[in-house]
Amino acid sequence: MSRHYRLTFPLLFSLLLLVAGQAHAQKPLALWRPATPAARAAAASPEPASWFTLDAAQLATRLAAAPPETRPTEAVTLELPYPDGTLHRFALTQVPVMAPALAARFPQIRTYAGHAQDDPATTVRLETGPAGLHAQVTGPTGVHSILADPAAANRYESRQDAPVKFDCKALPNPTAQQPLLRTTASAPTAPYGSQLRTMRLALAATGEYTRQLGGGTVAGTVASMVTLVSQLNAVYERDLALRLQLVANTDLLVYLDPATDPFDNSSPVALMNANEAVVNAAVGVSNYDLGHVLGYMSGGYSGIAYVGVVCSTTLAAAGASTGSSAGLMATVLTHEIGHQLGSAHTFNGDQGNCAGGSRSASLAFEPGAGNTIMSYDGRCNPDNVGSAVPYFHAGSISAIMSKLSCGTLTANGNHPPTLTVPPSGYAIPMGTPFSLAGTGTDADGDALTFSWEELDLGNASGLAGAATDATAPPLFRSFAPQASATRTFPALSSILNNTASTGEILPLVARPLNFRLTARDNHSGMATADVSLTVAAAGPFRVTAPSAAISAAGSSTYTVRWDVLGTDLAPVNCANVQILFSTDGGQTFPTVLLSSTPNNGTAQVTFPKTATTQGRIKIQAINNVFFAINSGNITLSGSLPVELTAFSAEARATSAHLAWATASEKNNTGFAVEASADGTVFRRLGWVAGQGNSSSPSQYQFEDGTLAQYGNPTVYYRLRQIDVDGTETFSPVRSVAVPAGLAAQFQVWPNPARAAVSVAGVAPGQVVQLLDLTGRLLLQKTQSTSGPLQLELPSSLAQGIYVVRANGQSRRLVVE
């Protein structure tokens, strides 16, 4: 079965020449070895990064064995570095980006695609060429690139990709276009992905681009183009089952001299206006499906394109992208070609650049600036929603699919996924959280990823006024596709922390809500399903007791209260609710306190015997999708279902040694050993099985070999004892004093974090800074005492990746 993987690595031109004559009797050496960061790294942007030295000869040998994509079972395995310094194994095959005739003229340029063996939803595009190796890895947690250091042979940086801000002008298609004369094919309908569509891309380069970003040569510029198109195909193949392939005479579109090329590089408009004639003359109007031109812009990025001109006899090459870095231009190019393929802008904001007339009323599905490929991510302050995601919104996909009427279709042996979603028609109360849960299956066993997105169109609206706008503008931003087909609106973390989630706005007016669930198999297959809700003039539905943190005894009774506010009446018609209990702060609710009770605002429950400091109550509407969670943790006292006679923890060199004993045990599955740097937030370290049922004494021990990781002078330990029925109870907490020197290391915890972090290894007088991935300072605090510094995170901080910096050291921080 043929599969189309994501990969892009540029490799040194000389690498493949070293394949012949390699001595196979030599002991294998590591492909990557840790390297000293380049001197310029200290002044570089603060994206998490790591540095490695590449064994170029070994890489050439291993890539030479890569099979074509039609033989995926023979894929070669290659280790690739991540920004955190770890190595991950990828399965790679050769994937064409150039037409065969073009590839024959530039044999030093090779392209590959693949997926991570430990996470099939993480893909890579890799290429080798005159400038070295380049790779871009895309997964549920983001995108990072492996880049050659031009100052040192075989030294590479693995760096988290930074967002790129650019100016864009989308122009409506002025006429009804006619399809090209050859390779026509009908537009697809979802689900799709059993065929891959290949379209011929005529990509031109100005003399300025060639000199500044292509090394001044045709070969270097073609290699740069291949890198860009490989990155585009990672997205287009995944979301659109579409592959772009550089036309055979692409080298004729590469210009070396700005003084003699046919382009005016002064603006994207001038470039676009000239490109149609240039491409038609060099390639021929019937020999390409889509055209674009690359220019150079010092210190910025910009683009322009007509919308929906792909496959046309005129304006098919009406698009231009300019920038100052070839590595970052893929973001611009993906967006601009997205216009040519058929998608207008998807933002609905009316502030900043969003107020400039580029909004499309028919595709404005994203609140504020939006954050998918066709949005104005980061350019519409104060309506930026943050956390750009490199995929097409469901609305963009529909618009593009309706325009794909040309290209060559090839069966790829893939089977699209199938989807099941809740029925439409639920009425929910205003200002009340809700969840939508789907399920997906894949005949090929592919690891599916899912995204729930809103499909509502209303008046242009800022984030501040959207909740009460009866014209039904979009309220909920997009998030990167995840392994779960369930989404909670707004994010569960904001509900539990009683904070606002930027770009997730609960409606406060009666209106419709429309959503689409998209399932991707990450092999060009996709399925979609829609769900419609109605927001009624009822609610908000919320828990009023407990209204804050409380303490109670396990197995005790408690009266839960909530606001009904018309949710028991039409059109919501919620007659009964279910009351659930969580012991992990609201992350899961496995305990049913009442399976069904009238929705009358009060019910008496019996708490479980489980001891916890992180209890929460959830009231879930029966036969509906809305719910409410109480606003504070519930502490329940309890005792272990074993007779614990001893529990100790002590430091031994760099480790902590834990020992405990029981006199007897009843229904004891075992002990989860948990640790905490602050005595409040614990995480699991390991598992020790229990005796089940025993009347005899038992001895247990556990070793925590990494005391330094906590970055704190004191580490806390506890046992989470679990019954055979799943009931959990906790032991007393024990503390360990970390030996001097270990606690002085620079550390940040918890990580991921929500409301606050502790920073260790910071001396009095030193400044701790919080930065986003663009280097923008968000918060700073001076250490005034010894011990960890407590850094409160701003409530307005969006979910995503940040950097904590102090005294020249940096740590990556994930905010949930």
Where are these regions (language model features)?
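Surface-exposed, proline-anchored Ser/Thr-rich loop/turn motifs
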Residues: 550, 641-665, 731-762, 771-778, ...
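The catalytic-center signature of Zn2+-dependent metalloproteases
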Residues: 247-270, 310-388, 453-463
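Short, compositionally biased serine/threonine- and acidic-rich segments at solvent-exposed termini, linkers
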Residues: 637-743
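Glycine-centered tight-turn motifs at strand-turn-strand junctions
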Residues: 602-605, 681, 686-710, 756, ...
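Recognizes extended acidic, P/S/T-rich segments that occur
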Residues: 465-500, 593-595, 672-712
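Extracellular acidic, Ser/Thr/Pro-rich low-complexity tracts
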Residues: 439-444, 521, 563-570, 664-666
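N-terminal prosegments of processed precursors
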Residues: 25-147, 270-273
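Fold-level signature of zinc-dependent metallopeptidase catalytic domains
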Residues: 27-38, 44, 155-305
